[in-house]
């Protein structure tokens, strides 16, 4: 794991790295769907795909680079493999059935958890110097 940022301050390299990891996992999921039940494939997804999507997503998840579309496509492929669905099956119902968040919802959830940890004063000390709650309950002061 790690975050890859290129000389142009673009997240494209990092997102391509995540796509490559998910592609490798998709191969494993595709092979497993012939032999193991859905709950085991979901565990494999949670072990091999989900950590790469979640890692530092607050930093790179709002990137508008071309790689984000490919990443979303790769996640959909992984979901179809977990659910043993056809290659053109609509993914939204599968996400609900499997109780898995798509990339966009993962970003929202991780961001909400981060903001919650700011207000509950549960950040590491290195972050506490940057994010300081103000008197207002609705404002977070960012000091740089």
What are these regions (language model features)?
Residues 1-144:
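Hydrophobic/basic alpha-helical segments
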């Amino acid at each position: 794991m790690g975050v890859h940022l290129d000389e142009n301050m673009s997240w494209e390299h990092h997102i391509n790295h995540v796509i490559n990891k998910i592609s490798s996992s998709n191969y494993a999921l595709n092979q497993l769907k012939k032999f193991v039940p859905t709950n085991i494939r979901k565990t494999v997804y949670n072990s091999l795909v989900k950590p790469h999507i979640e890692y530092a997503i607050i930093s790179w998840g709002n990137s508008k680079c071309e790689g984000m579309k490919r990443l979303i496509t790769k996640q959909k492929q992984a979901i179809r493999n977990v659910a043993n669905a056809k290659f053109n099956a609509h993914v939204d119902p599968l996400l609900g059935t499997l109780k898995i968040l798509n990339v966009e919802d993962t970003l929202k959830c991780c961001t909400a958890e981060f903001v919650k940890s700011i207000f509950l004063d549960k950040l590491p000390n290195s972050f506490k110097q940057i994010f300081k709650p103000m008197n207002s309950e609705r404002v977070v002061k960012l000091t740089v």
